Structures are given as structure tokens and as C-alpha cells.
């Protein structure tokens, strides 16, 4: 009887062995999935950091990367991910946006939420997506600085002597967002003039409608329009190269634009080139 018991113990439980093997394999797959997600996230973050630093920007935060429920391990065989979501941090450094002591300086990129669909990860540091949606956040100071730089560079070319004289002295000093009205109230030279700027999507791009505006009591539609175009469409055009503008809205911090692109490399999303 004892011998029979011993033989039973030696035989063990085949089902238990199978379950154990399955659990080990599942654990290995889970660990591998986590490790691969971390690796890809680091590659993308490092690529973003290198691109920004090469232009002199300071990167204090990593890119936040999410792959959702898409199995990343499968991408090792197919070199393609179903989708990816990124949150790129702002690296903007804006010096003297109101041009009080000379020309403003702009370095870096604004923050953005990026959604990539059907991503080719053959090059892990610079994936290419068949479709990309970018929601970029443009702070008021960025638009103010860009307007003052652009109008200063163009001074003297309007063909209107009065406008050229005024534009050489006038600076955009404030942009106050009014999300409820969908406008940005522009203030020039500390209150010398004001005008409401309404950003709109037009023909796949961004345009601005100017509502009111005078300088020293004299209508100066051309001057106001030059500042408005530079403030609203300038930064958006630089971000949106290769994209179609799908939406624009005034936010508490300035303006947000939604861009849509096809067959876009991640490196083309991460940065704005400035002077």
C-alpha cells in the first residue's frame, strides 16, 4: 500500500504542469510587452530631446507615450503598430515678446497632443504614421512675439507712409483670450489701439478676421491686419507645414489648432523652426 502511494506521488499532476508552463509563458509575454513599450517610449523621447536640443531648446520633461490596447510585441513581426498617442512637452523659451528692448527671440516648440494611426516602427527613433492628428497649444506670448518679429522685419513695405511710420513704433503688447466669444483682443503699445482677432479655418488653412481697430483715432486696417496675420497665422503656418488645419479654437491660454496629416514622420511633428 505504501509503495502504491509512492508511485502516485511520483506520477504528479499533468494538468498542474501545463498550467504552470502557461503561467510562465504568460508572465514572459507580459514582461516582454512592458519592456518593449518602455524601450519604444524611451527611443521616441530621446529622439524628441535630441531634436530640440540641437536647436538650442532646453527639454525638462520627457514625451509621454501611450500605445493603448495595441499589442506591441506583435509589431516586432509586422513592424507596424495600430496606434500611438504622444504628449510632447513645451520647450518654448520666449525672450522679450513685447519687443520692449529689441527684437523678441523664440526658441523651442509648443506643447502638443499627437495621435498616430498605423505606425511603421522600422525606425524606432522616428516612426512614420499613415495618419497623424496634432492638437498644438499656442500661448499668447508666442503669438505676440511672432507678430512683433514679423511686422518689424516687414516694416517699410506696405506702400503707405503713415502705416510704415506707425508700424515702426507700434508693437503688439497683449493678446487677451475670450473663449466664450471665440476672439483674442489685441492691444497695441500698451493701449494705443485695440482690436478683436477671430481665428477661423479657411481652405484647409488658418485665417484671421479683424473686428474694429484704429491707431491714434485714425483707421489703420492694413497695419492691424499685418499684426493679426503675423500673430495668428504665423505660428500656425510654421507648425502646420505638411498638414491641413482641421480646427482652431481660442483657449484660456491662447489658441489651440488641430492639424491633420498623412504619411508623416514623428520628427516632422515635434518641432517648429524659428529664426
Set out the residue ranges of the language-model regions.
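N-terminal beta-strand/beta-hairpin edge segment
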Residues: 57-144, 148-170, 182
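Short secondary-structure junctions
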Residues: 52-61, 166, 237-243
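Beta-strand elements of well-folded, non-transmembrane domains
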Residues: 69-71, 90-92, 118-120, 138-140, ...
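Short amphipathic alpha-helical segments
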Residues: 36-43, 143, 219-228
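Short helix-loop boundary/capping segments
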Residues: 169-219
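Extracytoplasmic/luminal low-complexity segments enriched in Pro/Gly and acidic/polar residues
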Residues: 201-275
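Hydrophobic membrane-targeting and insertion signals
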Residues: 1-78, 93, 267-275
Amino acid at each position: 500500500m505504501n509503495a502504491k502511494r509512492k508511485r502516485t506521488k511520483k506520477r504528479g499532476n499533468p494538468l498542474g504542469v501545463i498550467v504552470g508552463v502557461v503561467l510562465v509563458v504568460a508572465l514572459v509575454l507580459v514582461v516582454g510587452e512592458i519592456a518593449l513599450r518602455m524601450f519604444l517610449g524611451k527611443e521616441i523621447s530621446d529622439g524628441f530631446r535630441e531634436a530640440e536640443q540641437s536647436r538650442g531648446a532646453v527639454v525638462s520633461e520627457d514625451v509621454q507615450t501611450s500605445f493603448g490596447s495595441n499589442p506591441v510585441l506583435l509589431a516586432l513581426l509586422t513592424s507596424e503598430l495600430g496606434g500611438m498617442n504622444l504628449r510632447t512637452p513645451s520647450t518654448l523659451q520666449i525672450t522679450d515678446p513685447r519687443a520692449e528692448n529689441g527684437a523678441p527671440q523664440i526658441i523651442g516648440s509648443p506643447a502638443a497632443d499627437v495621435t498616430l494611426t498605423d505606425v511603421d516602427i522600422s525606425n524606432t527613433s522616428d516612426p512614420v504614421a499613415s495618419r497623424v492628428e496634432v492638437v498644438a497649444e499656442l500661448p499668447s506670448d508666442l503669438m505676440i512675439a511672432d507678430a512683433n518679429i514679423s511686422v518689424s522685419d516687414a516694416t517699410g513695405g506696405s506702400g503707405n507712409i503713415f502705416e510704415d511710420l506707425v508700424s515702426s513704433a507700434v508693437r503688439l503688447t497683449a493678446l487677451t483670450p475670450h473663449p466664450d466669444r471665440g476672439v483674442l483682443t489685441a492691444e497695441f503699445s500698451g493701449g494705443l489701439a485695440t482690436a478683436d482677432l477671430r481665428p477661423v479655418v479657411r481652405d484647409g488653412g488658418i485665417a484671421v478676421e479683424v473686428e474694429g481697430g484704429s491707431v491714434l483715432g485714425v483707421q489703420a486696417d492694413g497695419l492691424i491686419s499685418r499684426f493679426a496675420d503675423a500673430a495668428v497665422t504665423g505660428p500656425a503656418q510654421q507648425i502646420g507645414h505638411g498638414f491641413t488645419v482641421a480646427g482652431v479654437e481660442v483657449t484660456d491660454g491662447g489658441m489651440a489648432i488641430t492639424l491633420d496629416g498623412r504619411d508623416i514622420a514623428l520628427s516632422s511633428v515635434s518641432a517648429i523652426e524659428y529664426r
